[in-house]
From Swiss-Prot:
Recorded GO CC terms: axonemal microtubule; centriole; ciliary basal body; cilium; motile cilium; nucleus
Species for this entry: Gallus gallus
Keywords of this entry: Cell projection, Cilium, Cytoplasm, Cytoskeleton, Microtubule, Nucleus
Transmembrane segments: none
Lineage start: Eukaryota, Metazoa, Chordata, Craniata, Vertebrata
The name this protein goes by in its record: Cilia- and flagella-associated protein 20
Biological process according to GO: cilium assembly; positive regulation of cell motility; positive regulation of feeding behavior; protein polyglutamylation; regulation of cilium beat frequency involved in ciliary motility
């Protein structure tokens, strides 16, 4: 999808405020919902994914199962709200051995397991809004001893609220981020005016 796109800085794949936030995503919903709501904490539109079973309610990108993202930027950043329920997400990458590997992080697992094609790991979320930063290059090297080439697919499962999902060439400090990539809490906004 993005293979022939010049990639530097930031590449956003989901922005909850956009006119069609799920334009390049496919939705799967069973016993749950995926909808845009206004989050009280940030007074802004967010995407809520809720379901009784994390494995049956999710969004996946790209929408076409035969396509891949082709994103070479090594950092995946997600701005996610902790709903104090089970939550998991998965990223599929391609390494320099031409092998597709999956990384699955979840808040209900306690140990990391590395198998040939999937690495599952625990993730701890703070209360409220979190910025999850995932160094795909580092994880690929540490789990498999290979080099990260590109991201093929991202899948975000219930239960969470999403503000933005993007890739970047490196980790940026809060001051370096473009305004629309920051998560402003209303209290911070008032202090800055």
């Amino acid at each position: 999808m993005f293979k022939n796109t010049f990639q530097s800085g930031f590449l956003s794949v989901l922005y909850s405020i956009g006119s069609k936030p799920l334009q390049i995503w496919d939705k799967k919903v069973r016993n749950g919902h995926i909808k845009r709501i206004t989050d009280n904490d940030i007074q802004s539109l967010v995407l809520e994914i809720e379901g009784t079973n994390v494995s049956t309610t999710y969004i996946t990108c790209p929408a076409d199962p035969k396509k891949t993202l082709g994103i070479k930027l090594p950092f995946l950043v997600m701005i996610i709200k902790n709903l104090k329920k089970y939550f998991t997400f998965e990223v599929q990458v391609l390494d320099d051995k031409n092998v597709r590997r999956r990384f699955r992080a979840s808040n209900y697992q306690s140990t990391t397991r590395v198998k040939p094609f999937i690495c599952t790991m625990p993730m701890r979320l703070d209360d409220g809004w979190n910025q999850i930063q995932f160094n795909l290059s580092d994880f690929t090297r540490r789990a498999y001893g290979t080099n990260y080439i590109e991201t093929l697919r991202v899948q975000i499962h219930a239960n969470c609220r999403i503000r933005r999902v993007y890739f970047s060439d490196r980790l940026y400090s809060e001051d370096e981020l473009p305004a629309e990539f920051k998560l402003y809490l209303p209290v911070q906004n008032k202090a800055k005016q």
